[in-house]
Design a protein with these regions (language model features):
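The canonical alpha-helical register within tetratricopeptide repeats
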Residues: 87-91, 122, 129, 183, ...
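Helix-turn-helix repeat elements of alpha-solenoid scaffolds
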Residues: 36-51, 72-84, 112-148, 170-180, ...
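C-terminal non-catalytic interaction modules
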Residues: 4, 271-320
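Alpha-helical junction/boundary sensor with strong preference for TPR arrays
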Residues: 92-93, 127-128, 191-192, 215, ...
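N-terminal alpha-helical interaction modules that lie
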Residues: 2-87, 93, 98, 121-141
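Generic helix N-cap/helix-start motif at coil->alpha-helix transitions
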Residues: 22-24, 28-36, 59-70, 93-100, ...
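Flexible helix-coil transition and linker loops at the boundaries of alpha-helical arrays
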Residues: 57-61, 85-92, 126-161, 185, ...
Length: 320
C-alpha cells in the first residue's frame, strides 16, 4: 500500500500500550537548558550523552552470556562509535541485522543522518538469528530513540519497529529524500506521532488533500495533536478551504496548556488567513467597482455641499 491509498484518518491508535513517550516542542531556551544539563550530568559521572539512550539504567548482562552476546552488548551500551557495531556485524553474521540497526540508531542520535540511512536500510534487509532476536527482547526494550517527527517536535520512542522506521524516515528527510521518507512510514500502524511525521512530509510534497483526509476529526488533546492541527490548517489553507482551516486553528488555541510556540504559530497562521481573505475580496474587479462607487459618492458629496451653500446665501438675502 502506498502513501496515497489510506482512505481515512491515520492518527487513531487503538493499542493499550505504545512505544511512544510524551512529545516535546523544542525551543531555543529548552535546547540551551538541555545542553547545560547534559554537561553537568557528564561532569558528575553520568552516562555519556553520545551513547545509545536508555530509559532508566542500562540492563545488566546475565551470567555466562556467551562471547557473541557480550561483544554485542558492549558495542551497544558501552560505546559511542558506530564502527564498533559494524565490526560486530561482520564478525557475527547471524547478528548482523541487529548490529547494523543499532549502529544506524547511534549514528542518527549523533546527527550522522546519511550514514544512519545506509546502516538502517542495510540492517532492515538482513534476517537475524533466533539468538539475536532473543537478545533484543531481553536487553533492548528500554533503548530510547528521540525522533523529530516534525519541525521542532520530538518524540521519544522505545526500541521497536516504529522507532527504527521513524528514525529512518527522519534521516531520509534530513538528507533531502522526502518521498522516500514518506514511503518509509507507510506500513507503520496508526498513531499520532507517525501521523504527524507523515502529514508533515505530505505537506512538504504538496499532498494537501491527503493531509486533509488523514487528519479529519482531530481534536487538540496534547501538543502532538496541536502540531498536527497546524499542518492540517496549512494544507486546508492551500486548498482554499479557509473556513475549515480557521476551525483547525481555533482548535489549536482552545486548549490553554498548548505549547506557547504552537499557539504563536496558530496566531500567525490565523493572521495569514485573514490576509488571504482580504486579498480574495479585493481583486481587480472589486477595486474597479469600489472606485466607481467612490466617484459617485464624491459627486453626491459635492452636490450636497453646493446646495447647502446656495441655501445659506438665500437665507442671508432674506435677512437683508
Amino acid at each position: 500500500m502506498t502513501a496515497g491509498q489510506i482512505p481515512g484518518p491515520i492518527f487513531r491508535d487503538s493499542r493499550d500500550l505504545t512505544p511512544f513517550g510524551a512529545g516535546q516542542v523544542r525551543t531555543p531556551v529548552k535546547e540551551i537548558a538541555e545542553g547545560v544539563g547534559g554537561l553537568i550530568h557528564g561532569v558528575l559521572g553520568g552516562r555519556d550523552s553520545a551513547r545509545i539512550s536508555v530509559d532508566g539504567s542500562v540492563p545488566r548482562l546475565r551470567l555466562l552470556p556467551g562471547k557473541t552476546a557480550k561483544a554485542v552488548y558492549d558495542a551497544i551500551f558501552a560505546n559511542t562509535d558506530p564502527n564498533r557495531l559494524i565490526a560486530a556485524a561482520r564478525e557475527y553474521p547471524g547478528w548482523a541485522g541487529l548490529c547494523y540497526v543499532m549502529a544506524g540508531l547511534l549514528a542518527h542520535k549523533q546527527g550522522g543522518y546519511l550514514r544512519a540511512v545506509e546502516l538502517l536500510q542495510r540492517g532492515l534487509s538482513i534476517r537475524n538469528d533466533d539468538d539475536a532476536n532473543q537478545f533484543a527482547a531481553s536487553y533492548l526494550t528500554r533503548v530510547v530513540t528521540r525522533v523529530e517527527v516534525a519541525e521542532r517536535v520530538e518524540v521519544p520512542v522505545l526500541f521497536s519497529e516504529e522507532s527504527v522506521f521513524l528514525a529512518l524516515s527522519h534521516s531520509l528527510r534530513e538528507t533531502g529524500q522526502t518521498e522516500a521518507a514518506l514511503e518509509a512510514l507507510t506500513m507503520l500502524p496508526p498513531s499520532l506521532p507517525t501521523a504527524l511525521a507523515r502529514c508533515a512530509l505530505a505537506y512538504t510534497l504538496g499532498r494537501d488533500q491527503e493531509v486533509a483526509v488523514w487528519t479529519e476529526g482531530l481534536l487538540n488533546a496534547d501538543d502532538l495533536s496541536a502540531a498536527l492541527l497546524l499542518v492540517r490548517a496549512r494544507s486546508l489553507r492551500r486548498l482554499g478551504a479557509h473556513e475549515q482551516a480557521q476551525r483547525a486553528l481555533k482548535e489549536v488555541l482552545r486548549r490553554r496548556r498548548t505549547s506557547m510556540a504552537l499557539r504563536n504559530d496558530a496566531l500567525t497562521d490565523r493572521a495569514l488567513l485573514v490576509l488571504d481573505n482580504g486579498r480574495k475580496s479585493l481583486n481587480p474587479r472589486d477595486w474597479r467597482r469600489r472606485r466607481a462607487e467612490l466617484e459617485t459618492f464624491e459627486v453626491i458629496r459635492k452636490d450636497v455641499q453646493e446646495r447647502r451653500l446656495w441655501e445659506q446665501e438665500w437665507k442671508e438675502l432674506d435677512g437683508d
